[in-house]
Curated annotation (Swiss-Prot):
This is Pectate lyase 3. One of its GO terms (molecular function) is pectate lyase activity. It comes from Pectobacterium carotovorum subsp. carotovorum. The active site is at R239. Keywords: Calcium, Disulfide bond, Lyase, Metal-binding, Secreted, Signal. Binds 1 Ca(2+) ion per subunit.
Amino acid sequence: MKYLLPSAAAGLLLLAAQPTMAANTGGYATTDGGDVAGAVKKTARSMQDIIDIIEAAKLDSNGKKVKGGAYPLVITYNGNEDALIKAAENDICGQWKKDARGVEIKEFTKGITIIGTNGSSANFGIWLTKSSDIVIRNMRFGYMPGGAQDGDAIRIDNTPNVWIDHNEIFAKNFECAGTKDGDTTFESAIDIKKASTNVTVSYNYIHGIKKVGLSGFSSSDTGRDLTYHHNIYDDVNARLPLQRGGQVHAYNNLYTGITSSGLNVRQKGIALIERNWFENAKNPVTSRYDGSNFGTWELRNNNVMSPADFAKYNITWDKDTKPYVNAEDWKSTGTFASVPYSYSPVSAQCVKDKLANYAGVNKNLAVLTAANCN
């Protein structure tokens, strides 16, 4: 089922002109990004503009490099790459061999917020390395080139305290013949790895993605705390996320059209899966592909309450060639530690009925509350 997300306003709206955001992200992240005292505010019309603005912010007034950055940044992006996105859509199998395009934010810890204006779009990614306090909001990422070069839409490496909020990320849930490793027509929507922790992923609309996201890249990269809330995943294959160890809190998400597997909890990780809506989903909660060190989950107040609901919501299961655990009995296998932040989840039914009005871009960063569920 294709979800059509309505726009909250027409035309180009400079979202950065809104009041300073609160650091309560509804998850483990506690950052305002660059939207703090002393911030320098810039407008970018292109990927290169963003790169140049960030590079300039690494230097003091004398042109000397400052460790961690010279000042916090708020970058408003108003570029439009719809033509590149459309060309990529018309040449799906030609994208993976192209060079990856992206903005690398490396070793910047002063804080950066990148926020798109309504109507903006990007055919490039944003890649974080050894940085902290980064916020990415209202960005529309489509059909990233460079699948063979790890051309993710958003990549978070060695970077704590990140908020990914109200974005749209999309491609084609399809694999072209001859791709590198057999699965790189397009790379990930959001990969979080290499000791990155305290990350909140919220109110994003992610569709047509084969490999949605990693939480950890190896069996030794396991310690992180991540929150995924109020996201819509539509026509996606797997990795919602692929969790290697650590803790994941997934609440008030809508999962529809999962073609391989959903939340894959591995390497002794634990996930609190709370008040989500699952439909038309294959293996929505599982631990597979490792063959050992299974993860565990606590299932709390989702629309699916027992195996009796599987047929109603078209929930199906299959086996793996290695040892695996599926949530086929729809029972909790672990107990999640207390959640250390405040959050106010709505019912799973409200997620189904109302979330499309709030998730994704061009929604003026609106959030879904119980008052909106009536």
